[in-house]
Each structure stands twice: as structure tokens, then as C-alpha cells.
């Protein structure tokens, strides 16, 4: 396997958190490598298709490879041994009549319970926290669930579109984001991990690029701007 990698390193264990240099996903052709140093969890924001989910998968896969075959696709990788849990790519379950939201909260509770057992240090990866419910309850519940993960010393990597969480949880998590570039009415993604919370939005701009009516675009932009300024939706 090592001979199939363009570059790899032998992991170093004994350090709490994670220090990775030029970490990349081994299954992606011409991958963009990223470096990160963390002593507490990461809250990851960014627009659609900017690279959030891929980064979570990269770290999760690297941790598993480090602990199993002592090989990591990176220049250097320092961490500790963790029980790795994920809450990603979930689906509703018709066989058990479980809605998407029910599957989500069961998945997250299993991670919290693992941390409370204190059998092993836990590292977890959560993609789009509680996206299966309404905005108000999603932000309220996500805040408390992510706080609980941190309080139970679970080393968490969580991706979200809810920028509000970056302020509510800034004492418990490090904020990182991915950006997009829009030039000549085309969007591109550099896939470079950046520190801090995301400040840009691209959903309405994508509607414009796909030819939606300009009047519709302007009304949507005004609604978004009004909400940001006033904290409530206009009719």
C-alpha cells in the first residue's frame, strides 16, 4: 500500500490532539494537502462543495490508517490513540420507520455515550449537525450536543452551515473554514483550510449562475440581508 502513495509518513503517538502537516486524501487524484494543529475540537464552516466533508473524511481515514497499518498520507502526523466514531452520510431507515432526524440523534447519542464510558479516548466526525430538523431547534440542540462532546473530552470534528454555532461554541472549538472563488460568473474551490469562521455565502449566487430570474435573485438577497441586519425574516 505504501508504494501506491505519492507520499506518506509514520505516525507519532503520545500527543493529545492532532498535529498534521500536508495531510491529503489517498483516494483523490491530485489532492490538495492541508496542515492543522489542534488541542481541542474543530468546528468547520464553508459553502456548499467547498471541501468540508472531504476534509473530515481525510482526517478520519488518516487516524484509522495510523492506528492500523502505521501509515498516514501526510508529511508528518502526531496524535494519540482514539476510538474513532462517525456520524456522516446518514439516511432514514424505512425498515425501522426511523426518520432522518431520529437516525441522526441516535448516531450522536452513541458517540456521547462512548465518551461517558471513558474506556478509551474518543475522536468523532460529525457532518452537518442535525440538518434533519428546523433552524431554531437545530442550532439550540446542536450547541448543547457539541458542548456535551467537548465536556466529555471527545475530540470532535464537526462541519456545519450554521455560522451561529461558531460564536456560540468559540470557547470549546477551534473555528476553521473553506472558501470559494467566484470569477467571470464561474465558481471554483481552492480546498485550502483557513482559520476562523466562514464569512461568505454562495447559495443565492449559484441560483444566479444557473439562470434563475434576476428579480427572484434580488428578492432572495434582500431577504438574506434583512435577516442578517434585523434578526428576523421579512414577509
Predicted regions located by residue number:
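ATPase nucleotide-binding head domains, primarily ABC-like/P-loop NTPase cores
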Residues: 7, 11-235
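Transmembrane helical bundles of ABC transporter permease domains
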Residues: 1-6
Amino acid at each position: 500500500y505504501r508504494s501506491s502513495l505519492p507520499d506518506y509518513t509514520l505516525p507519532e503517538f503520545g500527543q493529545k490532539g492532532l498535529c498534521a502537516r500536508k495531510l491529503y486524501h489517498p483516494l483523490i487524484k491530485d489532492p490538495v494537502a492541508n496542515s492543522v494543529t489542534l488541542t481541542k475540537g474543530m468546528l468547520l464552516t464553508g459553502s456548499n462543495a467547498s471541501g468540508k466533508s472531504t476534509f473530515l473524511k481525510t482526517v478520519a481515514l488518516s487516524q484509522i490508517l495510523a492506528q492500523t497499518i502505521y501509515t498516514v498520507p501526510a508529511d508528518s502526523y502526531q496524535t494519540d490513540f482514539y476510538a474513532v466514531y462517525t456520524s456522516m452520510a446518514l439516511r432514514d431507515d424505512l425498515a425501522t420507520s426511523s426518520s432522518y432526524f431520529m437516525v441522526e440523534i441516535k448516531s450522536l447519542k452513541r458517540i456521547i455515550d462512548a465518551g461517558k464510558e471513558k474506556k478509551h479516548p474518543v475522536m468523532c466526525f460529525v457532518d452537518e449537525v442535525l440538518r434533519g430538523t428546523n433552524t431554531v431547534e437545530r442550532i439550540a440542540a446542536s450547541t448543547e450536543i457539541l458542548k456535551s462532546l467537548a465536556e466529555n473530552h471527545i475530540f470532535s470534528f464537526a462541519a456545519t452551515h450554521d455560522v451561529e454555532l461558531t460564536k456560540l461554541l468559540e470557547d470549546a472549538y477551534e473555528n476553521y473554514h473553506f472558501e470559494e472563488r467566484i470569477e467571470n460568473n464561474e465558481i471554483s474551490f481552492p480546498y485550502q483550510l483557513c482559520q476562523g469562521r466562514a464569512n461568505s455565502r454562495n447559495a443565492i449566487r449559484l441560483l444566479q449562475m444557473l439562470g434563475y430570474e434576476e428579480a427572484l435573485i434580488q428578492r432572495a438577497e434582500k431577504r438574506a440581508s434583512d435577516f442578517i441586519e434585523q434578526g428576523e425574516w421579512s414577509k
